[in-house]
Amino acid sequence: MQGPNGEGAVPEAEVPVGGERRVDGRHEHAEETTAAGPPAATAATGDPEAARRRAERRAERVTAGATELEQRLVDLLRGGLAGAEQAGGELWEETAARMVDAQAPGLASRVRELGSIPSSGPGWPVRLLEECALLHLLDQGWLRREQLPDGLAATVRSRVGLKAAADGPPVRDHWLVLAQYDTADARLTTRRVWLHGAESDRTALLLSYGAAGRAPELTLPVGLALDAELSAYPDAGRQRAALGRCFAPPESTPIRPRGLTTAQAAVRYGEALRDDPWLDSVPVALDRVVPVPDGDGWQLADADGDTALPLTRTTASQSGLWRLVALSGGAPVTVFGECGHRGFTPLTAWPAGPGPAVALS
């Protein structure tokens, strides 16, 4: 890596052990989608006993699916990875369909991703083994969920694909809109909105959905603040939230998120992995960083230190990178984004002095 002045090596902020392990960030999208709705049984009938029986029956089906998936992973490893390349995606599609039948859409999504790995380029056997290990870990988490701490058990249920309600107490705050961006597949458009509470110092994620080709309804302008209540969903990190009552329309604000160094950001991701081993990234604001070239990519280097975080490869092909470079002009800036095993994805930036937020996504 290059330092901010282009000379000498800048050591990267250390990525936690086990961090470099996933092919892309599509896993979280699937699990967030399946967990976004209301608690299915109780909302539909209002009969707690009937809801309990349905939940038990579904848990039994998920358990059967997880057990079958474990055996298929064992068969894969015993038969050798070359068989996975020869079989193509059909084997995985069949297994994914079995997980859908077991009412475990989160497992189905992860299984489908396995099918795409053999064609993902050099190094695919290592990536396939890593993904199989994470899938095995999720299977075992479900099968032994009663032995897990409550927060981790809730995360496992969410990752498997069970719906949950936003049961946290409403938290009223002036929520700064940190970033907003969409991802899409053939069926769904997902909008992610990151917020930061001025008083609670909490970062929260709102999810909104639209049919394929249609933008979700929820739109919050980046850089403005919203006086509103949020309620958290029950997972280990409790970052996902539902938007409740709004007391005023979004308005301009001088609020900025409190920033970290690049080394502190890497540590935060490592700590988050202890609560959610399947986590792709965490929201982080970096303070006083400078975008600098790094070979055929870019990095954000600490202006006052000797560490840096590489930008994700997809960032280099986006116009937001050049907006970030232009905003910085070689001077330190504050950057909010997502920090994970693939690097840092910048989403919004603020100049060193007074000035509005600049959306990069």
What name fits each language-model region?
Residues 1-37:
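Short Cys/His-based metal-binding microdomains
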Residues 3, 10, 15, 148, ...:
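Intrinsic-disorder/low-complexity coil detector
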Residues 34-158:
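Extended alpha-helical scaffolds
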Residues 98-103, 110-146, 154, 158-181, ...:
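Long, compositionally biased intrinsically disordered terminal regions
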